[in-house]
């Protein structure tokens, strides 16, 4: 009934078997799942196809083989890859975190793409916060420690926004929240984008899926500042060494050193580009006031739209090692649900929605921080992301992504 809303957790399923010419039977699971906060009259009637494979293997069909069959069945071969630069957007994992995707998956994909004439490379942008991935040298070293290098990954590894996070393209978008997203140059200059995402919880966005991988991960350091903050950067005077690097590199002449040799920002000139935050090596130039989870997710959707604008794109997500928090941490807590499988789609919105629905429907693992925080609750069918991070609102991001035409939340789940 399209005139009524269905509450969170109301899942309607229909199991069918479609026989295609020359193909084995394919089980089709259609899920119509909407949130009571959504006006259903605004939702397009068409559904995107999301393809799924479980993690069961045989000696003649390992997970790499199954992932390859999955993406071929999902239609990746319809893209013309010949002589095209293909950015495989991935998270290399912060050293110490062991939940990130194994490089074997990237290597097999890169080899397949090259067989189709593509020029693939793995890429990610530098981080805004301090850590082992805040500049390209440390970032590449971290990637190498986690198994990502041109030999193991079978393709080049490129940090998209350069040595210090200052190499980016402003993509004209005129979005409701982001007018010209700052996208890492290597990602912006790529001809085709493929996201390969470890689906997990996230302490600010609710969960980290394809949109988060692209929209946040593909933003330059200054872009990440725009995503996280609703105000201009500020100077922590006690940390400032008076090195003058922010003064030299401010494109708007908005920073000077005062009589105490401390940096000061002229907010009448500051445009909030975040380059001072990217360049400062002493944690003196820092972010201003952080945005709400809703606004963060709105901006992530618009940044994703900028990255994918006018480009062929394809998306793969792994519901494995679903840790409660992001792979940006230097540790990973125990998984909150059992491993479920791998999904693929041309629609990143439908893909994220399908992944979220599957995690919500799954049982929680006893002994995880989720069951320890909610020991007396029935967690199968519960919104595990909201339970883990109650101040987040992941639904808002998907609804905004659908609103701006990035994809649709309704989908048909096809098991391969």
Put a short name on every predicted segment.
Residues 1-15:
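Single conserved hydrophobic/aromatic residue that forms the stacking wall/gate
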Residues 12, 27-29, 350:
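N-terminal non-cleavable signal-anchor helices
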Residues 26-31, 43:
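Short hydrophobic transmembrane-like helices used for membrane targeting/insertion
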Residues 33-35:
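Aromatic (phenylalanine/tyrosine) cluster motif
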Residues 46-97, 101-105, 116-124, 129-416:
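Extended, low-polarity segments enriched in aliphatic/aromatic residues
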Residues 107, 112:
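Active-site cofactor/substrate anionic-group-binding motifs, chiefly glycine-
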């Amino acid at each position: 009934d399209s005139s009524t809303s269905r509450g969170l957790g109301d899942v309607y399923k229909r199991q069918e078997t479609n026989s295609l010419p020359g193909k084995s039977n394919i089980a089709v699971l259609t899920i119509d799942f909407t949130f009571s906060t959504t006006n259903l009259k605004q939702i397009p009637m068409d559904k995107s196809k999301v393809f799924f494979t479980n993690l069961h293997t045989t000696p003649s069909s390992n997970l790499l083989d199954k992932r390859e069959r999955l993406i071929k069945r999902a239609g990746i071969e319809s893209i013309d890859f010949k002589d095209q630069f293909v950015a495989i957007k991935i998270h290399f994992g912060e050293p110490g975190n062991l939940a990130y995707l194994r490089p074997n998956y990237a290597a097999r994909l890169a080899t397949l793409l090259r067989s189709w004439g593509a020029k693939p490379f793995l890429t990610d942008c530098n981080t805004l916060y301090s850590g082992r991935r805040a500049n390209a040298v440390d970032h590449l070293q971290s990637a190498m420690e986690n198994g990502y290098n041109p030999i193991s990954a079978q393709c080049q590894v490129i940090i998209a926004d350069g040595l210090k996070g200052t190499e980016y393209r402003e993509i004209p978008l005129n979005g409701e929240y982001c007018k010209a997203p700052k996208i890492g140059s290597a990602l912006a200059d790529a001809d085709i984008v493929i996201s390969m995402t470890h689906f997990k919880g996230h302490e600010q966005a609710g969960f980290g899926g394809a949109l988060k991988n692209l929209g946040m991960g593909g933003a330059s350091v200054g872009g990440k500042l725009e995503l996280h903050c609703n105000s201009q950067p500020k100077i922590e005077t006690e940390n400032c060494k008076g090195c003058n690097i922010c003064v030299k590199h401010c494109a708007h002449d908005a920073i000077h050193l005062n009589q105490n040799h401390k940096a000061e920002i002229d907010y009448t000139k500051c445009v909030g580009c975040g380059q001072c935050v990217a360049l400062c090596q002493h944690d003196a130039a820092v972010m201003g006031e952080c945005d709400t989870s809703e606004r963060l997710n709105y901006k992530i959707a618009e940044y994703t739209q900028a990255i994918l604008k006018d480009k062929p794109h394809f998306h793969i997500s792994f519901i494995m090692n679903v840790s409660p928090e992001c792979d940006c941490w230097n540790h990973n807590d125990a998984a909150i649900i059992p491993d479920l499988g791998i999904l693929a789609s041309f629609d990143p919105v439908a893909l994220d929605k399908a992944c979220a629905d599957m995690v919500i429907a799954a049982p929680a693992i006893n002994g995880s921080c989720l069951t320890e925080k909610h020991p007396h609750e029935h967690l199968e069918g519960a919104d595990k992301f909201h339970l883990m991070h109650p101040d987040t609102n992941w639904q808002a991001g998907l609804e905004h992504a659908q609103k701006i035409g990035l994809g649709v939340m309704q989908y048909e789940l096809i098991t391969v």
